[in-house]
Amino acid sequence: MKTIICICIALLIGAPVAAGEEFVDDFRSDELEGRLAERGEWQFQNGIASCVADPDLYKQFKNHGPILKWPREFNDLAIEFEMKAIDCQRVVFTLNGDGHIFRVTLADERPDAPAGKSKVPTRLIAWATKSSKQNKGDTIKPERMPDLPAVNGRWVRVQLNVKGRRATLTIGDFETEITHAALGRDKNMVMLTFAHGELSVRKFRMTSSREADHQSDP
């Protein structure tokens, strides 16, 4: 009996902590369970999702451009993908839950921008509580965060690692760390959208887990 108990304890001690769920989108098919492509004519070829913004659809959807969505429930997250924006006015990467939670916006704020100057600046926004017309969230502007002209026309790797109320964001050679209560909220959607121009995406990979909120984090 003691031998059996010892073996069970050894197995429990040696067992790895449950890994997060991994989701890979290789963009080789128009349809994939766990991914939605909306508000535009998305093309999926050779492992790349791409779309050219349609001005008429942009107006139809009340100034919202083509979007890719990956719905899944999670708290912590490690996500990475590569994107190539060509003459876009803005590219927006958002984590949603009960409303918006965390957003990364790259914008072209030049007066002579191909699609016109973006009214929305390059920035991060975090919502500690449910977003609304009254709750615009907290704006974060890390130093040296690249804008769209800095990455226009080339493939750029984007990574976001969220653990509790802390996150590390990487865009190309740029990296910043964020600590905010918003990051600890329950999440249920990853979204990538853009306005004007053309956006291509490849090598999308996400590992997520349903760990409880890390109350001990500052």
Regions found by a protein language model. Name each.
Residues 171-191:
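Short, solvent-exposed beta-strand-to-loop segments that form ligand-recognition rims
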Residues 133-157:
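Short, aromatic/His-centered strand-loop micro-motif at the edge of beta-sheets
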Residues 57-132:
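Secretory/extracellular carbohydrate-interaction modules
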Residues 31-60:
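Extracellular glycan-recognition surfaces and repeat-rich motifs
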Residues 27, 79-81, 153-163, 167-171:
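Short tryptophan-centered beta-strand motifs in secreted/extracellular beta-sheet-rich domains
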Residues 65-71, 93, 144-150, 190-191:
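Beta-strand-rich interaction surfaces with strong enrichment in secreted/lumenal proteins
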Residues 185-218:
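Ligand-recognition surfaces built from glycine- and aromatic
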